[in-house]
C-alpha cells in the first residue's frame, strides 16, 4: 500500500527594501528594562517639575521639538535621548527613526532613540501623573541624564547617510520570500529570504 504523499504548495512574495529607510536602533531587553525602571524611579511627579527637569513629554510635543531641531538647529536645544513608549510597528511612531536622524544631521549634537514598547507606558505615565505618555525627550542638562547616560551611550544614534554632502549610491533591493504550506494540514512555514535582486540605474 502506497503511503499518502503530502503536497506542499510554495508561494513567492517580493518585498521591496528601501535603501533610504532608517531602522530602529537595536536595544536588548535587559537594557530596556533597566531604562524603564530608571525612568519610573527618577521621573518627577508633577507638571511643574517636568518643565524644570528639562523634559518634553508626549508624542506630539516630542514631534514638535524634533521638527524645530531640524528647522532651526542653532536656536533649539536638541535632546540627548528620546524614549518611545509605543511598539515599533505602531503607525504613530514609524516615522521616529527618520525624524531623529534628520535632527541629528542638522543639529550639533546627537540624539539617541530608545524604543521601550507600549508595555512600559502605563507605569511611566502613572509616575508622571498622566493618563498616557507616548514619548519622553530628555535634555543633557536634565537632572535625569546622569542616571540614564551610561545605559544609552552604547545605543547607536539614528543617522541618514544619504543626507551627507557626498552620499554613496544605494541600490534598491527586492528580496524574494518563499513560504511553503502543506495543503492537507493548513500549516505554514516561513522560508529564508533569498538574496535580493539589485536594480541599478
Swiss-Prot record:
Alphabetical GO biological process terms: endonucleolytic cleavage in ITS1 to separate SSU-rRNA from 5.8S rRNA and LSU-rRNA from tricistronic rRNA transcript (SSU-rRNA, 5.8S rRNA, LSU-rRNA); intronic box C/D snoRNA processing; rRNA processing; tRNA processing
GO cellular component terms given for this protein: cytosol; nucleolar ribonuclease P complex; nucleus; ribonuclease MRP complex
Region Disordered: start-end pairs: 180-201
Chain intervals with Basic and acidic residues compositional bias: 185-201
Residues annotated as signal peptide: none
Superkingdom of the source species: Eukaryota
Broad class of where this protein is predominantly found: cytoplasm
Family: Belongs to the POP3 family.
Name of the protein in its database record: Ribonucleases P/MRP protein subunit pop3
Taxonomic lineage of the native organism: Eukaryota, Fungi, Dikarya, Ascomycota, Taphrinomycotina
Amino acid at each position: 500500500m502506497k503511503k499518502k504523499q503530502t503536497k506542499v504548495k510554495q508561494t513567492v512574495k517580493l518585498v521591496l527594501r528601501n535603501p533610504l529607510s532608517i531602522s530602529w536602533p537595536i536595544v536588548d531587553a535587559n537594557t530596556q528594562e533597566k531604562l524603564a525602571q530608571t525612568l519610573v524611579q527618577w521621573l518627577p511627579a508633577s507638571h511643574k517639575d517636568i518643565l524644570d527637569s528639562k523634559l518634553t513629554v508626549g508624542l506630539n510635543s516630542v514631534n514638535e521639538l524634533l521638527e524645530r531641531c531640524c528647522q532651526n538647529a542653532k536656536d533649539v536645544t536638541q535632546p540627548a535621548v528620546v524614549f518611545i513608549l509605543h511598539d515599533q510597528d505602531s503607525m504613530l511612531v514609524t516615522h521616529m527613526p527618520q525624524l531623529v536622524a534628520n535632527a541629528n544631521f542638522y543639529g550639533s549634537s546627537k540624539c539617541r532613540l530608545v524604543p521601550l514598547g507600549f508595555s512600559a507606558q502605563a507605569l511611566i505615565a502613572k509616575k508622571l501623573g498622566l493618563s498616557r505618555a507616548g514619548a519622553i525627550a530628555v535634555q543633557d542638562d536634565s537632572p535625569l541624564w546622569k542616571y540614564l547616560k551610561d545605559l544609552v551611550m552604547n545605543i547607536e544614534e539614528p543617522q541618514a547617510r544619504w543626507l551627507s554632502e557626498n552620499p554613496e549610491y544605494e541600490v534598491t533591493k527586492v528580496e524574494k520570500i518563499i513560504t511553503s504550506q502543506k495543503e492537507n494540514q493548513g500549516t505554514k512555514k516561513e522560508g529564508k529570504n533569498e538574496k535580493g535582486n539589485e536594480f541599478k540605474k
